[in-house]
């Protein structure tokens, strides 16, 4: 008999987008498998009236659940921060925890600027990300090949092994121009890389996946098809890995890895800088 997972509400409160708090909370809470966390995202809490509504919501949850919810905060405004801190939650001030120590180390006061880490609308970094996203979308699944020389990395692997989400994550998070190209049964029969990507061997990085997991994913897309049969998946995965080993292409299995882990490994293996 399996025990019922513990449930706990998690409030992610920010006076900007909340992306920083959400990313941090996800990394921390993923360490507790036995708890079913229920995230509630509350971005743009930038007035005292909004803060009072947040406090009421947190207090109501604490009363109904019988346990205090966890509150991750990247609030910068001192008044709003002080108000939300008084709620009946386990309050975690992410900026305050680190900023005060850095202020002491530098002998300086921080600017307390809301959303400073995301104010990039007109910056070169923002434009680079947009360019990378457009590139990755245009070069998804081998559909456009005329500018592969401009790619920072070309992900290769069998269909549905995770190439597209990894390409887009690299583009959105790190401004990496990531193309992706499928390895197909036709390539395995020829025993060679597709001619289109062969000249860019130095840019190639492979993704693989366990056949059983691949069959599950493919069955969601094309149920009961030859494409989704376990035998076909085993054949394609084995042939793709054999080809990557023969061609000297670094690769990893995506089966048990998060998109963040996959992307970080690609960056390290290919030698790309994080932007």
UniProtKB/Swiss-Prot annotation:
Enzymatic reactions: [pyruvate, water dikinase] + ADP = [pyruvate, water dikinase]-phosphate + AMP + H(+); [pyruvate, water dikinase]-phosphate + phosphate + H(+) = [pyruvate, water dikinase] + diphosphate
Binding site for ADP: 157-164
Keyword Cytoplasm: no
Enzyme Commission number(s) from the entry: 2.7.11.33, 2.7.4.28
HAMAP family associated with the record: PSRP
Function, as annotated: Bifunctional serine/threonine kinase and phosphorylase involved in the regulation of the phosphoenolpyruvate synthase (PEPS) by catalyzing its phosphorylation/dephosphorylation.
Protein name: Putative phosphoenolpyruvate synthase regulatory protein
Species in which this protein is naturally found: Bordetella parapertussis (strain 12822 / ATCC BAA-587 / NCTC 13253)
